[in-house]
């Protein structure tokens, strides 16, 4: 076995001659002609948002595929480098349509794979269904959306002359000799099953032979390259690797290295790319695509070369391959870059052979050995892959037009088509006439924002605001409250956040959850496993000391429901003496942040907080800045400077002013004046409402003052009249106010009661007048009518017993009545 391995290590360095192959890809089985049918739902329910579903009838049955648009497949401004006839480098940034590349699965097959592109008039890509791979592409000139589906033959005879090679050095071979006896253990090890999410930024170089094969058609070449990258990304996605096309170079005139010998070609290409590609743009690996034959090899890649500038490379041949088989070959050699060996007989996957088999079959699945190799290499040696595209510099060479403002530039609007729409910046990286800025939080409509304009608001009680200074487009740096300042009930500000155990439990398990008792922390965080620990070192969980148990994993209680968790998150439940403890685990393969770790700055006792999984005294955060230093009129920021309250000025909050700090920019000075104006406006509105109410009251009371009120009988007297009407005096006469002037009347006359200002005409004895309302006409009444009792203050002349006088309301006028 060792002898075979030695021959293998030496064999990859043998020279391999190559020549131009002008052969077209060959399919080994007739295609099925299918018409994809779009559906809106399946037998298992409606299609979820963002997913599309199609029926593809081929292979004797109907397949339902579900696909979704991919994100982060190409660099935002993909650079494409070409050469002039004189050898000068040209750069272009072509438009790349990024909403037509899909990934998905086949309904009913959980291990299926679908990778399709719809950018060029139909489906183009591969499908892995029930251990068989298929390639699909549109039927040329079809008017009915017809497609051709080819089965990618995986028989051994097809690939008997097409092997894979990888470049190793003596150290790598020696390591394999040492590990060869552990192959049995290796086959059952799935330590690589959980892996961190990684981004491989790849630069592709097209050699002149492949460029000629595409008849120098740049557009067609780019179309196929985008499809290849989409397929490779889908294949590597199952191990948590994202492939990002970061750049492209085409050798338009001639090959810049000699590609005719395996050993020399790979070394020459790795050296060339480290001297030419690396200075132009940062990347993780670079592959050279060619049509030259490599003595029966599908390509050759540097083993464990990722993140090493002079070794992160590979050469892959396009000779006699379809897009599907070539994409699988690229993924195979990327696997070598990521530390994967060729599969041995003891390696297994769900198919007879796996993608890292030496024969490079059209299979998309990785074996247990590949997972182990990948994990062993990448866990400590490929930290460059953990950085996202947003944390890396795309271009290392400073130049105008790259969209990055560099030294000597006033602005940079990027490509010409973007500059044409920019009102503030010109294509030569200078400002337009009349503009003072082109970007920044303190720039609006090509002008600086005025002094005191807030450019970054505080987001919580541990944050501080910043204001523009009126002379720059930049907003001051983001400052926040000094670490260790108390917040909420028992918390402390730490790095712009106020962490609280109860809130952390509620974020994980929902409303009602609270931090658990001390028992849960002691019992679980001292285990030193995925459920409870105080950190990870060298892939080993660290047990918490008793003094640090509050700073390990968060432990919760009062959990009534288990919410949906992210991938690979497991909820753990335990009981200790009728105490329920709830928590989440963490393993080395989780892609996102650990929601279950106790955050730094969380309280772990009186005057103690958690820092780096240890419970320390709060005095460790002390500085020369304190509330007393700010004269208790402000608070310290993370630069240990006073951020003064309103009405006081920095640096020490001793002088009257408008607040802020020496770091935050000048706060607005019109705040008090505005408040006074608002108060005046409010008072005026209230005064206006009061005047309106007073006016309406006066208007209603005016007619009442013009009328003379008649004093009505008291309630007691009214009740007396109603209860004993037969006891009225023989002569019932109205009472008159003392100031009344009453003319004499005859015994037969009947007089109504009148107010002092009234004049009463004489009436005949038979005249009888009823009680009427003002302005009413008085009909005659019988003499037997009774009269209301009058107040004692009135004086009344004598009348006859037959006289009955009705009471009249004020302002009534009594006309004379003739005797009946």
From Swiss-Prot:
Expressed specifically in testes. Residues 739-819 are annotated as: 9 X 9 AA approximate repeats. It is found in: Membrane. Residues 715-727 have a biased composition (Basic and acidic residues). Residues 397-483 form the Disintegrin domain. The lineage of its organism: Eukaryota, Metazoa, Chordata, Craniata, Vertebrata. Glycans are attached at residues 217, 320, 368, 428, 469, 538, 545, 558, 564. Residues 706-820 are annotated as: Disordered. Changing residue 305 to E: In a cutaneous metastatic melanoma sample; somatic mutation. Changing residue 434 to D: In a cutaneous metastatic melanoma sample; somatic mutation; increases the adhesion of melanoma cells to collagens I and IV. It is linked to Has been found to be frequently mutated in melanoma. ADAM7 mutations may play a role in melanoma progression and metastasis. Keywords: Disulfide bond, EGF-like domain, Glycoprotein, Membrane, Repeat, Signal, Transmembrane, Transmembrane helix. This is Disintegrin and metalloproteinase domain-containing protein 29. Sequence repeats lie at residues 739-747, 748-756, 757-765, 766-774, 775-783, 784-792, 793-801, 802-810, 811-819. PANTHER family: ADAM A DISINTEGRIN AND METALLOPROTEASE DOMAIN (PTHR11905), DISINTEGRIN AND METALLOPROTEINASE DOMAIN-CONTAINING PROTEIN 29 (PTHR11905:SF34).
